[in-house]
A protein has these predicted regions:
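C-terminal accessory helical subdomains adjacent to catalytic cores in phosphodiester-
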Residues: 2-3, 13-38, 44-64, 70-216
Length: 216
């Protein structure tokens, strides 16, 4: 199966190709395309932004499309938000294809949370980071999705500070996806969607309290 990735940021666009070969998916995963999805947009607006890239991916012969979106600080239940965006996006995909499938994965809360989820990989980058144990104490076990990941990367960077794209490129060259997934539930979801070996099924979403209805 050929899978097309749609991402919502330049950092993911540049960095993910460095880790995709190590995901171990049995499928062919194409290099990502960027689409202008705003994290606080409605599900319908997110689907519209993603759908503008559907013809490009379908022309490349993809059988499935995976859309990666930052959740940021949205209070919506992640599972309900995924379902809402998938419903809207699948309606738009059906206009172009009756066979292609589609899945949505939210990065909780953003791409940097996946980058901090593999402290041993960060230790390899000794010229870039110090005090990696500070990161490890916060992300392990299974807590990477809940930390201020960008703040941690900046705080533990050596002289020169942390550059989002260059830093992500370096980290993704060292990142062990399965090791990182042990600390990130949202990354485990991506590995599951891509059918990567070692990807444990994520726990069913637990929605704490009643969130407001997710608008179209």
């Amino acid at each position: 199966m050929k899978i097309g990735l749609l991402v919502d940021g330049r950092t993911e666009y540049h960095a993910l190709p460095h880790v995709i070969p190590r995901l171990g998916s049995p499928h062919q995963i194409l290099l990502p395309l960027v689409c202008d999805i705003q994290p606080f947009a409605s599900p319908a607006q997110m689907a519209l932004a993603a759908s503008k890239k559907f013809p490009i991916l379908l022309s490349k012969g993809v059988d499935s499309i995976v859309i990666l979106i930052d959740k940021e600080t949205r209070q919506d239940c992640t599972g309900e938000l995924v379902q809402a965006v998938e419903r809207e996006a699948r309606e738009r995909l059906a206009v172009h294809s009756t066979t292609a499938t589609l899945a949505v994965v939210f990065k909780v809360s953003k791409f940097e949370n996946w980058l901090v989820a593999d402290p041993p990989g960060l230790r390899v980058l000794a010229a870039m980071f110090e005090n990696v144990e500070r990161i490890e104490k916060q992300v392990a076990p299974n807590r990477a999705d809940g930390v201020d990941a960008l703040g941690l990367l900046k705080a533990c960077s050596r002289k020169g500070g942390y550059h989002k794209v260059k830093g992500a490129l370096a980290i993704c060259e060292q990142l062990d996806p399965v090791r990182a997934a042990a600390n990130s539930r949202s990354l485990r979801k991506l590995l599951k969607v891509l059918e990567c070996p070692g990807a444990a099924p994520p726990v069913s979403p637990q929605c704490r309290g009643r969130s407001a209805p997710i608008g179209r």
